[in-house]
Amino acid sequence: MMQIKRLLCKSCGLGTLLVAVVWLLALLFYSHSLRSSIRSAGWRIDEGNATPRAELSYQARVTVGCTPNASITTGESPAAPKPPSDPEQLELLGVVRNKQDKYIRDIGYKHHAFNALVSNNIGLFRAIPDTRHKVCDRQETTEAENLPQASIVMCFYNEHKMTLMRSIKTVLERTPSYLLREIILVDDHSDLPELEFHLHGDLRARLKYDNLRYIKNEQREGLIRSRVIGAREAVGDVLVFLDSHIEVNQQWLEPLLRLIKSENATLAVPVIDLINADTFEYTPSPLVRGGFNWGLHFRWENLPEGTLKVPEDFRGPFRSPTMAGGLFAVNRKYFQHLGEYDMAMDIWGGENIEISFRAWQCGGAIKIVPCSRVGHIFRKRRPYTSPDGANTMLKNSLRLAHVWMDQYKDYYLKHEKVPKTYDYGDISDRLKLRERLQCRDFAWYLKNVYPELHVPGEESKKSAAAPIFQPWHSRKRNYVDTFQLRLTGTELCAAVVAPKVKGFWKKGSSLQLQTCRRTPNQLWYETEKAEIVLDKLLCLEASGDAQVTVNKCHEMLGDQQWRHTRNANSPVYNMAKGTCLRAAAPTTGALISLDLCSKSNGAGGSWDIVQLKKPTEAEGRAKEARNSDKAL
């Protein structure tokens, strides 16, 4: 082809002009055909999705997601209302008072990867903070607005029963009944005893909702196929997929439905607030969007620079290259038109990236709706595997790469070092789907949807800011107190006795009692997030069932979050474990560990919070003068 073009160029300039005209007409015809096929099916999109406006061809300010101290803008109003419930009550919900509490906590972490004791104690419903920005509409919706009705599809496998019921209850309590067509539960062949018998009847009795439909798979199908099973049973205008460990916030559904009503080829995604897996504390998420790396792993990243200039910008919606996949709304008929999910994908993993590529490349869009907020329990691990132990993430990612990424799939294969002989199944049906929908190529996606993604071998986008990184030991924290932890009735203090490594205390060092002295290994600094930090370097951590150590501050709270009364004779309580600090004996060198708080209230478990006096300005100036004299 190149040789033919060269001959044409040599023969005459007119040939070059003709080639250019032919190419231009072909491109115009392709664009018109694609947009016509979308419109002929009745799908509406923002015109900016088909040909991005200049102001949307922006570069990312930061390309890493949610890293500590990264430049992230939150959508929380400065005057956001506080949660109606007393925070101290929430803190006490995880207290382990006896062996039964400990069993519930431990079995919850084993089966669900979160604190089931706290979840049980919260109950069916609770107040949570309204985390929307102040510009979001808080006026009640009426039927006159004529929004489409929604079918909620919630799939689960071996979910914690109280958490599942609360997920449904929040939908019922915070959704206008005329907008809620039904809730469809798809049980992916759960085998936990509490879920095996009479679950549907129990849910109907506790939740008192007649349009609750229950489907139980005859075998494990996985999240991906289970969602399609639920979607095919739905009758609402809009499908809303929700995970089974969530709490929806105030007026969460209306903004999603408004967007889909105006753009029915758009997948509408709420902002996903954070529910701590250890403490169930509900906190607002920053406004971020979805991206991915060349390993096809989803990641959060900042909104492009200049997105949020004035308060009205916080209404959104914002374009997002990918979505996390756990929570989103889509027109039901458009979901079918788009090809649902890839039914040959197994269990979990990669389906969110696949549907993200497919939506954008086939004429749709993904947008984050900041005035819709849904809290989600973010777990540190996935508590289940595939039935046969297969690497479903790898298989699913290979399928999406070979269908949607064209030659760019080679970057994924090289990144993951995938053998060429790895079996990812038959993809012929998905390739036919791509052809039928007249989808764009992956080069178009990279240029128009995700230009910030660095392609290996290409020059980096210069207008994109480099990732912000701060060493963990030098990050700025807001310290609110400085003290020693003295065992009540003694002159012994909690201390770390360990050698320093490169000038820092050794991570993983345990605590023991030592004679109280104002030395760095006994000085504790408390942050506004209730972290207790040794010498402003390492965080006190409940690192095992009973072990207490100092470790790198991960800033995820939970096992590094502590409570005390700030005075004498106080228990020191860990929020994640629900247990308290206790010394083995009131002697020098005695190990400090975690124990039931009921035991810790006695000998070995009560602590005096010995606050250190801050020097006056005069004392500070005198110290500086002495240091200057020494320097001279």
Swiss-Prot record:
Class of enzymatic activity (EC top level): transferase
Domain notes: There are two conserved domains in the glycosyltransferase region: the N-terminal domain (domain A, also called GT1 motif), which is probably involved in manganese coordination and substrate binding and the C-terminal domain (domain B, also called Gal/GalNAc-T motif), which is probably involved in catalytic reaction and UDP-Gal binding. The ricin B-type lectin domain binds to GalNAc and contributes to the glycopeptide specificity.
Swiss-Prot/TrEMBL catalytic activity: L-seryl-[protein] + UDP-N-acetyl-alpha-D-galactosamine = a 3-O-[N-acetyl-alpha-D-galactosaminyl]-L-seryl-[protein] + UDP + H(+); L-threonyl-[protein] + UDP-N-acetyl-alpha-D-galactosamine = a 3-O-[N-acetyl-alpha-D-galactosaminyl]-L-threonyl-[protein] + UDP + H(+)
Cofactor entry: Mn(2+)
Miscellaneous comment in the UniProt entry for this protein: The human ortholog GALNT11 (AC Q8NCW6) is not able to rescue lethality caused by the SF32 mutation.
Expression across tissues: Expressed at high level in ovaries. Expressed at low level in testis. Expressed at higher level in adult females than males. During oogenesis, it is detected in germ cells and follicle epithelia of all developmental stages. Initially expressed during early stages of oogenesis in region I and reaches high levels in regions IIa and IIb of the germarium. Highly expressed in stage 2 egg chambers. Remains highly expressed during later stages of oogenesis. During embryonic stages 9-11, expressed in the primordium of the foregut, midgut and hindgut.
Transmembrane portions of the chain: 7-29
PROSITE patterns to which the protein is assigned, alphabetical: RICIN_B_LECTIN (PS50231)
Keywords: Disulfide bond, Glycoprotein, Glycosyltransferase, Golgi apparatus, Lectin, Manganese, Membrane, Metal-binding, Signal-anchor, Transferase, Transmembrane, Transmembrane helix
UniProt topological domain (Lumenal) ranges: 30-632
Free-text function comment from the UniProt entry: Polypeptide N-acetylgalactosaminyltransferases catalyze the transfer of an N-acetyl-D-galactosamine residue to a serine or threonine residue on the protein receptor. Displays the same enzyme activity toward MUC1, MUC4, and EA2. Not involved in glycosylation of erythropoietin (EPO). It can both act as a peptide transferase that transfers GalNAc onto unmodified peptide substrates, and as a glycopeptide transferase that requires the prior addition of a GalNAc on a peptide before adding additional GalNAc moieties.
Consequence of gene loss (knockout): Mutant larval shows down-regulation of synaptic O-linked glycosylation, integrin level and signaling via Ten-m and if. Synapses show smaller synaptic boutons, expanded activity-dependent postsynaptic pockets which affect synaptic plasticity and synaptic strength in both the pre-synaptic and post-synaptic assembly, no differences in neuromuscular junction morphology. Simultaneous knockout of Pgant3, restores normal synaptic strength. RNAi-mediated knockdown is lethal.
Molecular function GO terms recorded: carbohydrate binding; metal ion binding; Notch binding; polypeptide N-acetylgalactosaminyltransferase activity
Protein name: Polypeptide N-acetylgalactosaminyltransferase 35A
EC number: 2.4.1.41
Residue ranges annotated for the Ricin B-type lectin domain, each copy included: 526-632
Membrane side Cytoplasmic: residue ranges: 1-6
Stored SMART domains: RICIN
